[in-house]
Regions:
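S-adenosyl-L-methionine-dependent methyltransferase catalytic module, highlighting the catalytic core
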Residues: 3-6, 155, 187-195, 205-290
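Surface-exposed loop/turn positions
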Residues: 120, 203-204
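Conserved N-terminal segment of class I S-adenosyl-L-methionine
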Residues: 1-180, 190-193, 261-264, 270-283, ...
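A short His-aromatic
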Residues: 181-185
């Protein structure tokens, strides 16, 4: 259970960062949270000499955890310490619970590409149990998954979903790459975004969803306690901002689409875009010719 330290912004690589919150891992609040959330599976004493620190980038305003799990510990969190049964149970009646969201996303994709479903290739990066992809598979899209958890990969394979084992060494190219509640977990969001763009077809799109950090800084006072919010200790290591994405794509062949409703216009969709300007929990990015 080792932590590694980030000394510069993972979004823009700027070193002008400041500490905005700190809490020892051996504090009562942190021990109570980690013990409860991970159901006693983590040996918290191994973290006692470390601090949960939130830093803010002076350039792109990204808030991020300074000390984060190394690759081995991160894999253990996802595969060993997070209760798999609870994780899977949360997906009960997935399509019924999220019907409106799924229909909106499918309509958006169809409007963007204007071709038959089976001709549209989709990659879900960080696919988890694959319920999002399964909805699109049922609607005849050409779907693929990238996932790091062996348990979840086995589940995906049982549901006949094609797996991409590596986003670096693959010949596959995709029309649309989707990722939900993944980018807040990864240590290198900029590098990951650029690597995803390399397996995107020309004029393809990347859509990312993540927890909103709207007004989060107002909660950072002496009474703040760690919880499963946008700054979840050890897990939500990046609190993503639009300015952060703008910096990530500098000198790339990517551009941010501010209004998704331009492809699928309705008053409801337009108002969603207005809300997202402030709340910001999703971003649509297009690959352009340069």
């Amino acid at each position: 259970m080792s932590l590694t330290t980030r000394s510069s912004c993972p979004a823009c690589k700027d070193s002008r960062i400041k500490e905005i919150f700190s809490l020892p891992y051996n504090s009562r609040e942190m021990i109570e949270f980690l013990s409860s959330y991970y159901k006693g599976t983590i040996d918290i004493k191994k973290l006692y000499e470390q601090h949960y620190k939130l830093l803010e980038c002076g350039n792109c305003n990204l808030i991020f955890q300074e000390q984060i799990p190394n690759k081995k510990f991160s894999q253990e969190l996802y595969e060993k310490y997070i209760d798999k049964d609870d994780s899977l149970k949360k997906k009960d009646d997935y399509e019924k619970k999220y019907h409106k969201k799924l229909f909106y996303e499918m309509s958006l994709i169809k409007k963007i590409f204007k071709k038959k479903n089976e001709e549209i290739s989709i990659l879900d990066f960080g696919a988890g149990w694959g319920f999002w992809l399964n909805y699109f598979k049922k609607n005849n899209f050409d779907v693929y998954a990238f996932e790091v958890s062996e348990t979840r990969i086995d589940f995906l394979k049982k549901n006949k979903i094609k797996i991409i084992p590596d986003i670096i060494n693959t010949d596959n190219k995709f029309d649309f790459i989707y990722s939900e509640e993944t980018f807040e977990h990864i240590s290198d969001p900029k590098e990951t975004l650029i690597n995803l763009s390399k397996i995107l077809k020309e004029n393809g799109f990347i859509m990312l969803r993540f927890p909103s950090s709207f007004l989060f800084k107002l909660r950072l006072n002496d009474g703040y306690k760690p919880c499963t919010d946008c700054a979840h200790p050890l897990e939500h290591i990046n609190l993503l901002k639009k300015k952060s994405f703008e910096n990530m794509i500098i000198d790339s062949n990517l551009e941010i689409i501010n209004f998704k409703s331009k492809f699928n216009f309705s008053l409801r969709n337009f108002l969603k875009d207005i809300k997202n300007i402030f709340y910001f929990d999703s971003v649509l990015i297009k690959k352009i010719n340069k």
